[in-house]
């Protein structure tokens, strides 16, 4: 994520927009798998694999030509009498990602609302839409902090920690077919954002550090439960199923920490 901030020029908000778009595409497609059971990838950057490839490609290109994303693509073009518009490569990159995310979100919500039987059994439309709450929360936080405090590396790190914590929780719930605590996850981000909003730069470091600690704790907890779920001797053990398939009784075990 820091590659995007450092590589998208002096305007750090484009780096944060780059992060939000890539993460939102990953979140929306994982959300679709949780509420529907399948993932349908449109063309663009909604595929998580494509998003990761894009991050790596950005890193490689910027390592060779750090200023390449500052190149002018459109210079002073007026559309239908509007004010002249100038676009750089970084603007085109982020805007194309944002368009893909928006179209994917509209498509998924349309299918949930209009196609009977699209949602999993016991999954209501209201519940499915509520699972998008962390996505909206992080985007609103990013917008508010950028307007109030401007781009800053620690703001970027804190937002990235919130984004990755919510996507990790969503993935865990998708794997275990558990209820996603969307409201709890969203509300847990608010105190840090409010602290930065009120206290300013003094709260940026705690906001970033606490976010990373929460993410690390959840990740380690996830690894511990994954070891039990797979029947492994330990986190470094080679996986061997006791039968030719996973232990069916173990698959029915509840994971209490969720």
Model-flagged regions — what are they?
Residues 1-24:
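Multi-pass membrane catalytic core of lipid/isoprenoid biosynthesis enzymes
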Residues 23-258:
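C-terminal membrane-associated helical module and adjoining short loops/tails
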